[in-house]
């Protein structure tokens, strides 16, 4: 029989469980899945906002939004569209009931346990699809899942459970690379946003001067060719700094320092075409963006809370 077995609301930042259903089936298979719930809660920040983990006879689905993740355990044959529609209802109700200040400042596990009442009622509705089908419209969710299907988490990305390495890890040596591609950065700060805008401005200024250099190149004997290359390299470096500021990549800090070095070299070469204030502005912005890239790190691992 296809059905939802349990659901939880977890804070993404540190894996703190905020609320959960309390009548979870106590079979051995479900208890094993609770371990996967616990492991996933530690790594929510590393995954996209819509994911599925298949554990054999059961599936764990979750969505994340505004720093909170909504997780559910269901049987393997439970329809995906119903699963994510269920999670979407939990998300809408939770956001309506609790503001971000409360969720961000919560310190005790299950401090919103009263939300369990809504989880239970919604779970009962979704475990009776005949009565449910006349009350909700699943077409939008079906289209959304078709256009943007949930990320299928390989078992090896969870690492080990209770010190015992998962058997699936042997077949998934590249898991670290997959996970890092979806890792999230800490929320952007005001200084980070300013750095992003200034870097775009420097890139635009370099691009404009590069096109002017092309015009001069067409009218001269080719002496402006090297300046044109320097301007376009400066543009590429500024845009790449914007990319590093927004997205997580491997060796991110090293890449940012190398990019800053390229910005400095380009401005040294363009010394004759820019005054000291222009050079100071471009180099200072490059240094400021590099600092912001270094400060905005990947979200850390969560502590060990039971879910």
From Swiss-Prot:
Modified-residue entries (N-acetylserine), positions: 2
Cell wall biogenesis/degradation recorded as keyword: no
Chain ranges of the Longin domain: 8-119
Cytoplasmic side: 2-187, 248-253, 296-307
Lumenal compartment residues: 209-226, 272-274
GO cellular component, one term: endoplasmic reticulum membrane
GO BP term, example: protein transport
Keywords: Acetylation, Coiled coil, Endoplasmic reticulum, ER-Golgi transport, Membrane, Phosphoprotein, Protein transport, Transmembrane, Transmembrane helix, Transport
UniProt-annotated location(s): Endoplasmic reticulum membrane
Record flagged with keyword Nucleotidyltransferase: no
List of residues that carry Phosphoserine: 6, 8
Top-level taxon in the UniProt lineage: Eukaryota
Spans traversing the lipid bilayer: 188-208, 227-247, 254-271, 275-295
Major location category of this protein: endoplasmic reticulum
Membrane topology reported for the UniProt record: Multi-pass membrane protein
Pfam families assigned: Longin
Entry similarity comment: Belongs to the synaptobrevin family.
PANTHER family named among the record's database cross-references: LONGIN DOMAIN-CONTAINING PROTEIN, VESICLE-TRAFFICKING PROTEIN SEC22A
Role: May be involved in vesicle transport between the ER and the Golgi complex.
Protein name, as recorded: Vesicle-trafficking protein SEC22a
Gene coding for it: Sec22a
């Amino acid at each position: 029989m296809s059905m939802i077995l349990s659901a939880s609301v977890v804070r993404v930042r540190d894996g703190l469980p905020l609320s959960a259903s309390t009548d979870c089936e106590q079979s051995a298979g479900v208890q094993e899945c609770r371990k996967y719930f616990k492991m996933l809660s530690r790594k929510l920040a590393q995954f996209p906002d819509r994911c599925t983990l298949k554990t054999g006879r059961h599936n764990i689905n979750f969505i994340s939004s505004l720093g909170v993740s909504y997780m559910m355990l269901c049987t393997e044959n439970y329809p995906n569209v119903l699963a994510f529609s269920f999670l979407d209802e939990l998300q809408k109700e939770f956001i309506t009931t609790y503001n971000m200040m409360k969720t961000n400042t919560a310190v005790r596990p299950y401090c919103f346990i009263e939300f369990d009442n809504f989880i239970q009622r919604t779970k009962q509705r979704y475990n009776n699809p005949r009565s449910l089908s006349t009350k909700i419209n699943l077409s939008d969710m079906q289209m959304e899942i078709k256009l943007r299907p949930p990320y299928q988490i390989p078992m090896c990305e969870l690492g080990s459970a209770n010190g015992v390495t998962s058997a699936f890890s042997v077949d998934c040596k590249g898991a670290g690379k997959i996970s890092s591609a979806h890792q999230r950065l800490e929320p952007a700060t005001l200084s980070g946003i300013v750095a992003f805008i200034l870097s775009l401005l420097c890139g635009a200024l370099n691009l404009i001067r590069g096109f002017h250099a092309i015009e001069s190149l067409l009218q001269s004997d080719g002496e402006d060719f090297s300046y044109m290359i320097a301007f376009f390299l400066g543009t590429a470096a500024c845009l790449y700094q914007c990319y590093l500021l927004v997205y997580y990549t491997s060796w991110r800090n090293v890449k940012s320092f190398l990019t800053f070095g390229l910005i400095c070299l380009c401005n040294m070469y363009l010394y004759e075409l820019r005054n000291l204030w222009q050079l100071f502005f471009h180099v200072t912005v490059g240094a400021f963006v590099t600092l912001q890239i270094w400060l905005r790190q990947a979200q850390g691992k969560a502590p060990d809370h039971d879910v």
